[in-house]
Amino acid sequence: MGVRAQQKEKTRRSLVEAAFSQLSAERSFASLSLREVAREAGIAPTSFYRHFRDVDELGLTMVDESGLMLRQLMRQARQRIAKGGSVIRTSVSTFMEFIGNNPNAFRLLLRERSGTSAAFRAAVAREIQHFIAELADYLELENHMPRAFTEAQAEAMVTIVFSAGAEALDVGPEQRRQLEERLVLQLRMISKGAYYWYRREQEKMSHHSE
């Protein structure tokens, strides 16, 4: 990559980081102004268009980055698990770490999931679908259950995790710890339920074939 391309990439990154830093519990992406984001990134507002077509393209890039960050973290969690950690507890603590370290990235995913922009809703749905698919792959590999079962299990788990994540954004450390414990219990219940449901279906099939 040439010097100019490196500089362009650096400025693009500055714009993304500036936009993330301006999000908060009180401030959504829709309320950000191009001028403020450019000023925070240290560039003239007119230079913004060298990097993004418009503010929406910046937002979609942020959605993609948020989803990718979360998926990469969960992959790291699975590597920790491979070294002997508890699957559910390690995954939950990794997820809560992500929210603690990147609250605005998670806020963006939550808000735009049901926001007014169809493009943003589709982008968040795609990120969540990637997340579900990766978890279903992992469950299929670990539990030796058919894809239909692992997909249903992964979808239920991700739904509960995102709901707990929304709560975790607005509570203190002690409440977050309690939330984490409750989430671990709920995920274990789903996991056990999926396992016993699958076994019951297998037993039914073996009775029919006899």
Swiss-Prot record:
GO terms for cellular component: cytoplasm. Residues 10-70 form the HTH tetR-type domain. One of its GO terms (molecular function) is DNA binding. One of its GO terms (biological process) is fatty acid biosynthetic process. It comes from the Bacteria. Keywords: Cytoplasm, DNA-binding, Fatty acid biosynthesis, Fatty acid metabolism, Lipid biosynthesis, Lipid metabolism, Repressor, Transcription, Transcription regulation. Its main location: cytoplasm. NCBIfam families: PRK11202.1 (NF008402). This is HTH-type transcriptional repressor FabR.
